[in-house]
């Protein structure tokens, strides 16, 4: 979660050493909004509510800001509504929710689906999903995971931060990394996640701390 927050530009954190590049740019020197415009997306563990701002207005502004950054014309109302219908179908998000204030009164599962809907609308180059599976029942987990899988292409990437293997019942990762004390201490394929689910993390941590 700390890594995700730092990459996204959370001002609570100060980077004292090291660097981070994204698409050939110095990420750490960029303001939050430019990181988003460039194609970095962060899905929150606990999505916030924004009373008074409808999902439709929120997403139209966000999408057109990205288009402006790329030198593209803004979407017309008809084009935007068509895009919103297409992307909401990816995560089975009810059209009733897109007309309501952002996350206001949404269930936990609806908030997480809404995060993936936003990801679909913004089409980021790099999406970081922080504990997206937290608090989801099995049906919501399946829908969210299926949405993430559908959005994966050769020209984008998704980092999924999780402590549980169950999400990987639906998402097959290209690489699994174990982050401990600020460092990647082990990497592997899905079999590593299965082993961690079965044996826990102690064998890795003990080896690292030795």
Predicted regions and their residues:
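Q-loop/switch helix immediately C-terminal to the Walker
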Residues: 38, 42-46, 52-68, 80-83
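Conserved H-loop
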Residues: 155-163
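ABC ATPase C-loop
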Residues: 119-120
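Conserved beta-strand-loop-alpha-helix hinge in the C-terminal portion
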Residues: 175, 179, 183-206
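Conserved ABC transporter NBD signature motif
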Residues: 16-25
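Walker B catalytic motif
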Residues: 128-132, 139
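Helical segment within the ABC ATPase nucleotide-binding domain
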Residues: 141-154
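Helix-to-loop junction immediately C-terminal to a conserved catalytic motif
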Residues: 8
């Amino acid at each position: 979660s700390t890594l995700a927050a730092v990459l996204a530009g959370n001002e609570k954190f100060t980077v004292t050493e090291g660097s981070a590049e994204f698409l050939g740019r110095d990420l750490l020197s960029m303001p939050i909004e430019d990181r988003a415009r460039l194609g970095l997306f962060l899905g929150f563990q606990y999505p916030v509510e924004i009373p008074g701002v409808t999902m439709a207005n929120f997403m139209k502004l966000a999408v057109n800001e990205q288009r402006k950054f790329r030198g593209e014309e803004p979407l017309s109302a008809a084009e935007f509504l068509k895009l919103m219908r297409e992307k909401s179908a990816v995560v089975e998000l009810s059209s009733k929710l897109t007309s309501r204030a952002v996350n206001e009164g949404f269930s936990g599962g609806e908030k997480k689906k809404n995060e993936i809907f936003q990801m679909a609308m913004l089409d980021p180059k790099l999406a970081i999903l922080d504990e997206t599976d937290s608090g989801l029942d099995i049906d919501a987990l399946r829908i969210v995971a299926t949405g993430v899988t559908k959005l994966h292409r050769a020209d984008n990437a998704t980092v999924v931060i999780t402590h549980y293997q169950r999400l990987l019942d639906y998402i097959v990762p290209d690489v699994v990394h174990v982050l401990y004390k600020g460092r990647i201490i082990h990497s592997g394929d899905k079999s590593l996640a299965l082993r961690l689910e079965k044996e826990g993390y102690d064998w890795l941590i003990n080896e690292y701390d030795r």
